[in-house]
Structures are given as structure tokens and as C-alpha cells.
Amino acid sequence: MKQIYLFLWAALGVVLLSTGCSSTSAIPDGEQLYTGMKPTEYVDADKSEHATSVREELEVVLATKPNGSLFGSPTLQSPLKIGLWIWNAFSQGTTSFDKWMVKAFGTQPVLMSYANPDLHTTVGRNLLKKRGYFNGDISYSLVPQKNPKKMKLQYAVKMGQLWTIDTLGYVGFTPGQDSLISAHADEAMTRSGAPFDISTLESERQRITQLFRDNGYFYYEKGMASYLADSVSRPGTVAVNLQLLDSIDGRTLRTWTIRNINVNLRRSLFENIDTTSHGRSLRVHYNGTHSPLRRRVLSNQIKLKRGDLYSASLQEETQQ
């Protein structure tokens, strides 16, 4: 068996040498082999933490790995692209051996049509806008190689001015909700002067949702408030308001307290429950004559008590 493998590799070496180890001989007409990126150029980019974070995201968005990529890099390639050589040497063949070689050892070439720089620049521009660079732009250039069947890419990123938060307001909430927001203002995920950032604003909306649900607003959900932004009044800044929707029903706007707590104890998902043990506010449902857990143990584990404001965090902690 070892001799067979040695023979195959020796034969493969002869074939590759005879074809000049070409990486483009079987590339279709009208196509070019993508051979990686030159380092992206950044114009007028500052060294702030926010700008650095955006650059790191852009590197991921713009990257396309070529054949023989080293460590997943779009700019570094191994000089030995054996899989690509095999594909070029055998992919045009019609014999069973040709097909087996391509399937077993070949690597399909990464073509320029797959690299699709137009798509990457569009996604990159959208990212810049979401991170506060409203006037940012991305372009690319094709970098010809000695072999006309090969092509590199280079992107250029003009980040432009970073737009910041002018004011952050909360509109349409009840007096009780306004009081909660004010009491926890120091926990806000963004504030005046901070970069305009869609992901940070979404985190702030989630924080407000969690704040309400931990303070009795059982029916409140994140989608019940949305952002309105004004980027016209003061160029370079955005006035942002998180506004409660108009069509919210009354039960969402009031707080709810804990009355009775019901606990179902099952040894398996489909076990029938036929017994209920009643307490002042705790009802334990189980199968059989005795509860699998003592009431005191259950009471110590349950973080919500009768008369308390409902808290989603305490409910989750109880259920863990």
C-alpha cells in the first residue's frame, strides 16, 4: 500500500512538472484568478477607539481569502498551491482518474467573480453609516499581475467626519417610566458627544426594556419604542429620541405585582401532575403523595415573593 501511494505521488509530481505547475491553465476565458488583496488604504482615519473598532470590522467585511491563504489572511499566500495546481492539471480531463484526482486533491480556484469587490464595497459603506461615518466611502482598484490571468485587489476607505450624538431623549413614556429612566441615567449605553452608532443605540433600547421589565412592566417589549433621529438641525451631530409607540395598550403602561406562584415539579417532560400543595402564595404541583422537594427548599430558591414588583431578571434567576 505504501508503494502504491509513493507511485501516485511520484506520478503526480511528473504531471505537475510537465504542466509547469500552472495555477491558471484551466481558468475559463473572461475570468481571472483572484490572488489576494494589497493592504487597505485608510484616508483621514483617526486613532480613536471607535475608529479602530470600525477599521477592524471593515477588514473582515472587505476580506476575501485567495487560494493558498496563510492563516486565513487575504493578503498572505503560500507559494505552494498544490490543490490549485492539481485542479488546473486535471479538471479538463474526462477520465475517471482525472475526476478522482480533482475530487481527492484538487482545490477550485477563487475567481475575481467570486471576490465580487462591488458587493464588498456596498456592505462596507453601509457599515460606515451604521457606525456614524455618514459621508464615508469605499472604492477599490484592480492590481494587474505579470500573468494577465491573475489579478489582485486593493480597497481605499475614506472615513470622513464622525457624526456624534447631540442629545438623547426619551419621549412619550409615562411619569413612572420617566422616573425610572432618570434614576438609572448613569447606566445609559450612550450619551451626548458619543459617536452615533446603531449597535450602541440598540443596546440602549435593550437596556431600557430590561429596566422596565425588572421594575414591574411585565408586558413591555423592546419593539414598543423606536428611534427618531434628526441629522439636519446641527450638521455633524444627530439629535436622537427613543419614542414610545402611540398604540400601546393600558396594561403595558402599568406595573404588575406578584400574587400567586405556581411551581410544577416533573421528573420527566410528560409526567402527569395530580397533586397540589397549597401555601399562602406558593402552590406546588407534582405527581404522587409527596413533593419531590420540600417547600422550604423551594421557597429559598424562588426569588420572587408575593407583593413584589415583577422582575424578569429574578424570574430568570429562579428558573435556572
Model-derived segments and their meaning:
Residues 1-8:
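Bacterial N-terminal signal peptides that target proteins for export
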